[in-house]
Amino acid sequence: MMITLRKLPLAVAVAAGVMSAQAMAVDFHGYARSGIGWTGSGGEQQCFQTTGAQSKYRLGNECETYAELKLGQEVWKEGDKSFYFDTNVAYSVAQKNDWEATDPAFREANVQGKNLIEWLPGSTIWAGKRFYQRHDVHMIDFYYWDISGPGAGLENIDVGFGKLSLAATRSSEAGGSSSFASNNIYDYTNETANDVFDVRLAQMEINPGGTLELGVDYGRANLRDNYRLVDGASKDGWLFTAEHTQSVLKGFNKFVVQYATDSMTSQGKGLSQGSGVAFDNEKFAYNINNNGHMLRILDHGAISMGDNWDMMYVGMYQDINWDNDNGTKWWTVGIRPMYKWTPIMSTVMEIGYDNVESQRTGDKNNQYKITLAQQWQAGDSIWSRPAIRVFATYAKWDEKWGYDYTGSSSTNPYYGKAVSADFNGGSFGRGDSDEWTFGAQMEIWW
């Protein structure tokens, strides 16, 4: 008994050590931004985005507190085989008060199994909700290829000249389908499940320092038996993507061409949309009706120009042509140079211009925005974070058209009808004006 009692503290200590080691093995990653800002004409900070544009230049132009908190752990490993569990919870509030309650968005919960298939070494099987191989332009927070959502797939299959990945994900729309008619009136209140099937061939070395990635995405509305969609709804569509990545000036340049049809044109990033509807108080249905096509040509990157200068840049042309004439032509160009005074202090400027033409009216909206920021960051790269910055932003815009949401409860552009600024004696768009803001912000990823 004495021997047993003497061994007990040792066993407890060993168990505690094992539990501590396991706890330390948990990976904690994430992203967050928050700050405070003011508008020159009074009130809290305003943010500036051109009507019809799908993004905005973000430096000194973000008006919310946003965070993604990721916890993950390799839960099993034997040789080169392993299972990894990953999660991600996101929050967003208006940063107007101390206590701002919000419902979290459960964005990721998946398991990834590596090297589980003997005859496909290096490949990964996965299932669950996941940020899946997302492609974006950081300086305008624009995701141009992103099929994230609940799904499953097999990725990084070595085919000799590149890596092949296969995936299926889902993005449901609120409303859009109906099971039966009462008095010959269909009530399209049932949500519609949209499936996306994705095939990618990446890491193809085609020139010194350059790689090519090709992808095909097919999206479709997946209706329940005996259900129907709103007449004219976009039921399916395709997205084709080609992206060339070139190593240059201690950074990279990405040149992208994308072409989409019908349901894949609304967001233009690989998620199928076009079956959902919005309702007013009388439950009248407004169909998205986005049959048509989209062409996008994009060039963006980040480079180092000597010891003291870094720069991000973007140039993009996007043409969405819809059968209902509610499409747009959008082109944008911008730069973000950074001068490094010390390894942890820099001055950053961002200059961006947007121009959006309405397919229906032929009118154009345009805006340019300039931000100057003094920044302290953890390192001497334009990608170094965390960063604390103080900024001043000036924006000037001239908008000749806007969206008319008469009869619709939604303010999604795809439910609104593009009209000239003075349509029916109204005032649509933001008119011709300018404004400036100033404030401070932190940004971090880890």
Curated annotation (Swiss-Prot):
Membrane topology: Multi-pass membrane protein
InterPro entries noted in UniProt: G_neg_Bact_CarbUptk_Porin, Maltoporin, Porin_LamB, Porin_LamB_sf
Site (Important in sugar transport): Y143
GO cellular component, one term: pore complex
Signal peptide: 1-25
Pfam families documented for this protein: LamB (PF02264)
Catalytic activity: beta-maltose(in) = beta-maltose(out)
Record-annotated site: Greasy slide, important in sugar transport: Y31, Y66, W99, F252, W383, W445
BP-aspect Gene Ontology terms: monoatomic ion transport
Keyword Magnesium: no
Induction statement: By maltose.
Coiled-coil features, chain-numbered ranges: none
Localisation per UniProt entry: Cell outer membrane
Recorded superkingdom: Bacteria
Gene3D superfamilies to which the protein is assigned, alphabetical: Porin, LamB type
Main localization of the protein described in the UniProt heading: membrane
Keyword terms of this UniProt record: Cell outer membrane, Ion transport, Membrane, Porin, Signal, Sugar transport, Transmembrane, Transmembrane beta strand, Transport
Gene Ontology MF annotations: maltodextrin transmembrane transporter activity; maltose transporting porin activity
Quaternary structure and partners: Homotrimer formed of three 18-stranded antiparallel beta-barrels, containing three independent channels.
Role noted for this protein: Involved in the transport of maltose and maltodextrins.
HAMAP family with a match to the protein in the record: LamB
UniProt record similarity statement: Belongs to the porin LamB (TC 1.B.3) family.
Name of the featured protein: Maltoporin
